[in-house]
Amino acid sequence: MDMSMSGSSAPLNDSGVDFSNETQAFDFLQLILDDSELQVVGNAYARAFWYGIVVVIGIAAIFNIIRVMTLKLRIRMAAKKHVQSARPKNIVMRSIATVTALGREIAYPRISPASGPAWFKVPTFGTILLLLAYLAFVLVLEFSNDDVPGGQHYTALGIRSAWLAVAQVPLLILLAGKYNLIGLLTGTSYARLNVLHRWVARMLLLLATIHFGTQNYGWDQYGLRKLEWSTDTCPRTGIAAYAILLWLNLSTLAPFRYFAYEFFVVQHLVTFFGFIIAAMMHLPSTALYSRVYIYIPIVLWFLDRVVRSLRYFYNNVRPGRATLEAMDGDVTRIRVTSKQVTSWVPGAYVLLSIPAFGFGQSHPATIASAPSSHSNDLVFILKGHRGFTNHVLKSVKSSAASKMEEETPPKSYVALIDGPYGGQHSDFAAFDTVVLISGSTGVTFTLSILLDLAHRASTQSLPVRALEFIWVVKDISWIRWISDELTAANHQLRTAGIETAFSIFVTCDNNFSNFSTDEDKASGCQCDKSLGPCCCIDVADDEGMMPTKSEESAGPAVCSDRSDNILPCATLISGRPSFKPLLWRLLDDAEGETGIAVCGPLGLSMSVRNTTSAISDERAVHKGTGAQGIYLHAEDFSL
């Protein structure tokens, strides 16, 4: 198909047209609006867009299949007592590892102002490169071979952008569903796809703006805009769809989501259906086949909702029962006993609802337990902020106060569960060395992985030789949240012959950090107390965040005087961790690929990301030096 339309007819021009004559002006306007051939071309470019999307998804799916098969092969080799099962053995696997290492070094880094507004976050370099490629691809489709001469020049640009805009809608919905084909094929979590979902919406807005602008500018060239708006319904339905689309994009900006998330979800859904209706009314009768790009996302959305509804009904046909426990640091520990939800992937999360604290409200919560732990109960650790978590915290505190006055059995509440979701990261049991890093309640993510590894190591041989667990907390009392779990996991791992080291960095506890100079040196603390508590010091140099005895504090876990009474299996350190020397030492000792998981505030995950990428480059991973690969999975606190 010749999509240039060159040579099909002479260019439209206004010679001999008297625009003061309304009949002649209207006839010329109809010639400008004659899009019978332009619609065919636009449809072809919309299909070309989807050909490109399918190719990208296909490539990502192939890499995902290779990744999953490689991890499964490692575990099978370890079960057969093969040594260095997490190390690529042949030239094919080494070549794949080299390409993977290069891609990770580019994709992992992230530069975002950690001290800025909570809602302002810059994506990772990998996401930025993907978005730039996406933008370039769409703009090439919009402007390539589209220089139609004459009076229909801007009409051609507008029609092309309209087709490309409507072609974005199915992709928009595919990236929004919690159960979606793209996530299944590529092994990408809903949270990561949701970032792309928002950027596809922005691309849709950009294309709609180009469509609106070029059409109106084309009419203005001949003074016909007023005539078009007064004689055609298309501009009015178009401005309605555009206004709704603009609001959809504005309301998804982080400040709006942070302000009232529950309201955002409801209005977002209602507004989206308003956009679909307005878009259907706007699509011209000359291109009714373009509505297939609207019908498809409607079907996809309903399929996602049907699957979610069926799963929700199954989960809650026999509702779970939740018991609550108030803990230090304004944290509530929730334990849910459910006969329906009995299996999940480590690191998965659910939308948890306890009707007693807000009917119809649900809160995303990472499952801190593993299916093999806590008698198959789901355990959550929620920090009290506002809304649901604040209601739960206040209630459990008041209940605890009343229990002190009179002994009563723990009260249980009906708990409704939507999920579990997530957990698309690689299986950490397939790595030679595992590093689990978390901050505050981000420990729920790493703890579930730790408990799963401990259980599996006690029942089978795994590729894992060494494990480092790092937890950054503000107050030493927070350790009690999971002290029993850490003690049990440490025992299981050591019994299985896995080298373990548990390091807990306490950043903001005066009682812990305010001891003598000799004690500081013995425990590895290097915070200058004259500047205030450790958490108040702005550490600009990453090297300055590591305790003086970095090798001792990051080495095998020992029972120090500072940890006997709270967590005997861990080393407690006052200050912040410096990840470069710690990771470098672990990678030096690794005999195969290292898996790193990090969950916590943006500053923590960003530091680990950038350090991992830098170390991989400096060590020339899989580039002939013998240095083994580094896999990183990062989870951030976000909505």
Predicted regions and their residues:
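Ferredoxin-reductase
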Residues: A322-S412, K474
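Classical protein tyrosine phosphatase
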Residues: A162-W163, A191-F212, G439-I470
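Extended, low-complexity, polar regulatory segments
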Residues: M1-F26, M69-P117, D377
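Transmembrane-helix exit/juxtamembrane "anchor" motif
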Residues: I57-K80, L174-I182, L253-F259, L303-P319, ...
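Non-transmembrane, juxtamembrane loop and terminal tail segments
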Residues: R76-S112, G320-K339, E406, N511, ...
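Membrane-embedded alpha-helical bundles of multi-pass integral membrane proteins
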Residues: V41-V55, S95-V306
